From Swiss-Prot:
Protein name: [LysW]-lysine/[LysW]-ornithine hydrolase
EC primary class: hydrolase
Predominant subcellular localization, coarse grouping: cytoplasm
Function according to Swiss-Prot or TrEMBL: Catalyzes the release of L-lysine from [LysW]-gamma-L-lysine and the release of L-ornithine from [LysW]-L-ornithine.
Keywords: Amino-acid biosynthesis, Arginine biosynthesis, Cobalt, Cytoplasm, Hydrolase, Lysine biosynthesis, Metal-binding, Zinc
InterPro entries: ArgE/DapE_CS, Bact_exopeptidase_dim_dom, LysK, Peptidase_M20, Peptidase_M20_dimer, Peptidase_M20A
Family statement drawn from the similarity comment of this UniProt entry: Belongs to the peptidase M20A family. LysK subfamily.
EC number(s) given by UniProt: 3.5.1.130, 3.5.1.132
Biochemical pathway: Amino-acid biosynthesis; L-lysine biosynthesis via AAA pathway; L-lysine from L-alpha-aminoadipate (Thermus route): step 5/5; Amino-acid biosynthesis; L-arginine biosynthesis
Amino acid sequence: MFLEKDYLKLKIKQFLPEFLSIYTPSGEEYKAKDFFEKIASELDLSLQVTSTNSYLLGDGDILLVGHVDTVPGFINPKEEGEIIYGRGAVDDKGPLISMIIAASILNKNGYSVTVGALSDEENKSKGAREILRIGKKYDYIIVGEPTNTFGVVVEYRGVIHLDILCRARSEHSSSATSNLIFEIAKKIINTTRINTGYDDVSIVPTIFKSGEYLNVTPSNAVVHFDIRYSVRNSKDQIMSEIHREFEGCEIHEVEDISPVKVDVNSDIVKVFMRSIIKENYKPTILRKRGTSDMNILKDLALKGILAYGPGNSSLEHTDHEKISLDEIFIATKVYINAIEALWPKM
């Protein structure tokens, strides 16, 4: 009964609109506590609320992990037929509901799994870092991000966030012999790399601050760079080039998350590909240009990690987030089939 389409769709319609009605931007995941207590009780899953306001449902050696937080900007949930709209429908509440329903069915069938509904993924990944600090290892970790329902993500790029502070002597603008803004602008132009290929380093300035007075050249300037790089790039080389260009400036590394890449011939990837085929769809291998909790959690996976989930990834972070019952139904079946196939390999 549990795998019948009507039953699964009924559960999705029961849980997802309510979840979407709870506005949980990063830092406000605590608002979902009552919801998780309710869903855990109804689906007979144990529940642990952590210090970062993440929620752990069930207890097993396979971890299904998604995130509770969304980007800012509430969207009133609505339903049109079998389409559900709302902030987080795609990223990441739709995939998370799919995982929780799959986990409840798997646990009833004797396959013990844990669902991690983590906090702060859209910010500094406090939830994932907390799981990393706890240190429990899992045989397999599946990260529930929207992968267009038929995609399997085997690679995410890493990220480096840099704040660079440069100083100079300020002068009256009418008789200035130099200008820090002009000098730093040249360095920014020399450093920036946009519209690059996947395996090329992307270096994008996102914040620039300088100057205090209308008639005085600035004494300091701050630029923030968002740097993305793949496993084929060297962080040391990237940083060496930055230090050379901004010699004499203070360079502060705000965040560094290393890239992650999974062997396409690994058991977990092949099993998920077969599970999608089993549902009569053609799977695709994906490489994501951004970064996710998969980068942070990779060292906790003893045998394999990947990302898979329902939802059109092009709708992430937009005001048009929507997901269909069919997408979540298919993903739920894929999660169940894949974990049942992985179980003998543990």
